[in-house]
Amino acid sequence: MEMPREGDYIAIQSYKHNGTLHRNWRDTMVVKTEQNIIIGVNDRTLITEEDGRKWISREPAIVYFHRKLWFNVIAMLRPDGVAYYANLASPFILDREALKYIDYDLDIKVFPDGEKRLLDADEYAMNKKRWHYSEEIDSILRSTSFELLDWIDQKKGPFARKFVQIWYERYNQLRPDLDRSFFKGRENEERKILGT
């Protein structure tokens, strides 16, 4: 399938190694595409969990996906600053239905103050055993963890300060419903979070 264009909405589907659908984001606006990269924004997006529970995201989030990297990144714009959630996951594929990837359980969360935390190591150990992750996948994910920490420390790619500002501004240029902005009436808060 050809890459979506800026302003298009796509669904994002996260699967587990055994092929089960883990989570679905219904409407993500694409703000940038390159040969191997899709950057999008979720803003009050309907999310459906594997057990059927549905909820709406509370704050805008910029998502970064790469066809060759074994992680994806969510930058969440929160009142106290930008927090990052990096999923160790397969590179994405794209078909008519959605952007899809396999979630490999491990996550690195970066708080607005810069603190980093590895999450779900116990879930990874359990699923590795249950679903027989290969040694190759285990090795890729271990090396990717170090690569990801390096990106975070060097403020590379989606962790660069300007990344959030640039792509959130682009989102606001593309969206037809600007009066629904998360920051409507709170522009000073927006400037503080984005560092503008």
Curated annotation (Swiss-Prot):
GO molecular function terms listed in the Swiss-Prot or TrEMBL record: magnesium ion binding; nucleoside diphosphate phosphatase activity; ribonucleoside triphosphate phosphatase activity
Binding site for Mg(2+) 1: 87, 103, 107
Residues annotated as the enzyme's active site: 23 (proton donor)
Gene3D superfamilies hit by this protein: FomD-like (2.40.380.10)
Enzyme type, top EC level: hydrolase
Catalyzed reaction equations: a ribonucleoside 5'-triphosphate + H2O = a ribonucleoside 5'-diphosphate + phosphate + H(+); a ribonucleoside 5'-diphosphate + H2O = a ribonucleoside 5'-phosphate + phosphate + H(+)
EC number of the protein: 3.6.1.15, 3.6.1.6
Cofactor(s) the record lists: Mg(2+)
Keywords, sorted A to Z: Hydrolase, Magnesium, Metal-binding
Protein function: Has nucleoside phosphatase activity towards nucleoside triphosphates and nucleoside diphosphates.
The family this protein is said to belong to: Belongs to the Ntdp family.
Full protein name: Nucleoside triphosphate/diphosphate phosphatase
Source species of the chain: Lactobacillus johnsonii (strain CNCM I-12250 / La1 / NCC 533)
